Amino acid sequence: MGLIKFSANLGFLWSELTLTGAIYAAKEAGFDAVECHWPYETNPKDISKALLETDFIMIGINTRRGDVDAGENGLSALPGREKDAKKAIDEAISYARIIKAKNIHVMAGFSYGDKARDVFIRNLKYACDRAIDHDITILIEPLNEYDAPVY
């Protein structure tokens, strides 16, 4: 049986610090790796430097949520937002390649019904087709109806 390894989710831990500061804090706290939700406001070269200096890997990142002020929490299952979803997927893959993240959570968003499911499946196929050449795994995160209705 292998050793247990712990990853710090920097979307929840050390949120008062910059993302790079949180990476160093995770190292000091004894974590083995890090992950984060939305790193896009930080220069990926700065993240790469912090990861190299801490000997960490970035487990994964999420695609952008869309218009947070309008209540969006993902774009990939939103009919009519396919162009925006593909842009978010492409951005996440480009960013992940720079920081060497191996997983991307493609955020569905708040939607329901057959059309939303079909749009989500098409966007997931799009993401997989682009990620496979870079050895990046595409993830989904099913959420429960209580915490995130129609996600």
Please provide the spans of the model-predicted regions.
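N-terminal pre-domain/capping segments
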Residues: M1-R97
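Active-site acidic/histidine proton-transfer and metal-coordination neighborhood
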Residues: L75-Y151
